[in-house]
UniProtKB/Swiss-Prot annotation:
UniProt cofactor(s): FMN
Cytoplasmic side: 63-325
Listed name of the protein: Iodotyrosine dehalogenase 1 homolog
Organism the protein comes from: Caenorhabditis elegans
Coiled coil: none
Record PANTHER family: IODOTYROSINE DEIODINASE 1 (PTHR23026:SF90), NADPH NITROREDUCTASE (PTHR23026)
Function: May contribute to coordination of muscle contraction as regulatory subunit of the nonessential sup-9 potassium channel complex. May act downstream of sup-10.
Amino acid sequence: MKKHTHHKAYGDSTGKEPLIDLQSIKLWLNSFGNQGHSSEAVLNVLFTLGVILFVIYQVASLLHRMNKRVEKQLESRTKQRKVEVADKHVGDEMVFTDLHENVIRERMIPYRMPVINDDITLRNSQIFYEEMKMRRSCRQFSSRDVPLKVIQNLLKTAGTSPSVGNLQPWTFCVVSSDSIKTMIRKILEADERDNYVSRKKGASWVVDVSQLQDTWRRPYITDAPYLLIVCHEIFRDVHSKTERVFHYNQISTSIAVGILLAAIQNVGLSTVVTSPLNAGPDISRILRRPENESILLLLPLGYASEDVLVPDLKRKPVEHITKLY
């Protein structure tokens, strides 16, 4: 007795249900013949089935090609990303580029500087130098108020400074509160006094008391209408997990301070660059600054008093600070 074998299409020997059972199709076609249908109708049905199978095959092939194309595009983008990162000397750690989104996705715009002839350029450079050579560290301030809008413009100018990866890691704290300035002054003076005493040990300290008071006191911290406290980031959270230290943020912020000093001189105000020494953490707590910030410098800001005295500085000539190659 013959065993009936079922021919399966798109099936395999794993026991999976086939997509198309040829035996069922054969029985269905026989039913057409038994019902008196013409052979032409059977051929039409077969043709229709063939067309359907062909369409299914074409769709499957198209989807397969599309998947391949997407995979190639993703691979190409990954390679291009690595090339861009390498060209910008970012390094191998992709976590670094997550902090610098503009490294990959920066948008370039036209840049045009006004065309100035050499005579005007020379004149402007000389005028700017004559203005900047008048700059002095001022420790005596008048009570004349400074409009807050002027302070904002000065800080906007400082914010134009370049920074590594355009992180702009600086924060400028503007203190006008007398009580806060008084607290900061006490902390600075206590720290400076301890620092000075540690250098002046022994009997000579008694002799230097009068000079000591002039040395460690910081009256300009409270005398100036404003006290600018310059902070910079020392780390940043990456994916809310990893903390990365940025040593170059101090360099970027220092450049911004240089631009700020020039802007201060340009508007006729005065300041003196003051280091926080070891008082930075205490000042940060007073200002409630986040833990990822460190205080770089303090800048009391205002108009110089009429009776102010400044050192008679002799700056090095340009030939002593320049090397031509």
